[in-house]
Regions:
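Metal-cofactor-dependent catalytic cores
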Residues: 1-152
Length: 152
């Protein structure tokens, strides 16, 4: 039986080094990114970044503090689904949006600033997923996330 996850948080960063702003809904623009996010229109392979809530919890446990989604600089937080299993796979968010997982979302050096000393190394292997938008639409908190079975 396929896993079905749930979207629990959305964040948009208007400028490159600015703090992510929490949203309840966002428009996913086909081939471009999330409306209002600074990555919109840049690399199609990294249009959207996702992380699992469980990984945020693990990182926080190792560092001895609560980690907010803004600290990791990822756009979407999900629970109930293994994001890494979605690499090179198409998956839906809600009833409209289709993404394709493009790879691991590796941590950047800003994790040392955002999470504190050791933050970069703790995030290694827990950074989440990068994806591109194949079909746009509205994404909202509570949307279901699931693999689209291949037709092969």
């Amino acid at each position: 039986m396929p896993q079905v996850g749930t979207l629990t948080w959305i964040g948009i960063r208007g400028k490159k080094k600015s703090t992510l702003e929490t949203q309840t809904t966002v428009q996913a623009l086909e081939g471009k990114g999330l409306e209002g996010d600074h990555y919109k229109g840049k690399s199609g392979k990294r249009s959207v970044t996702l992380i699992q809530q469980g990984h945020l919890n693990n990182v926080g446990e190792i560092l001895g503090k609560k980690i907010s989604p803004q600290d990791t600089r990822r756009n979407l937080v999900v629970e109930g689904i293994n994001l890494i299993a979605l690499i090179d796979q198409e998956f839906s968010i809600g009833k409209e949006v289709i993404l394709k997982g493009t790879g691991h979302c590796h941590p950047c050096s800003r994790m040392e600033t955002n999470l504190g000393p050791g933050g970069y190394n703790v995030m290694r292997g827990h950074g989440g997923l990068t994806a591109r938008i194949l079909r746009g639409g509205t994404i909202k908190i509570g949307d279901k996330i699931q693999l689209i079975p291949s037709k092969a």
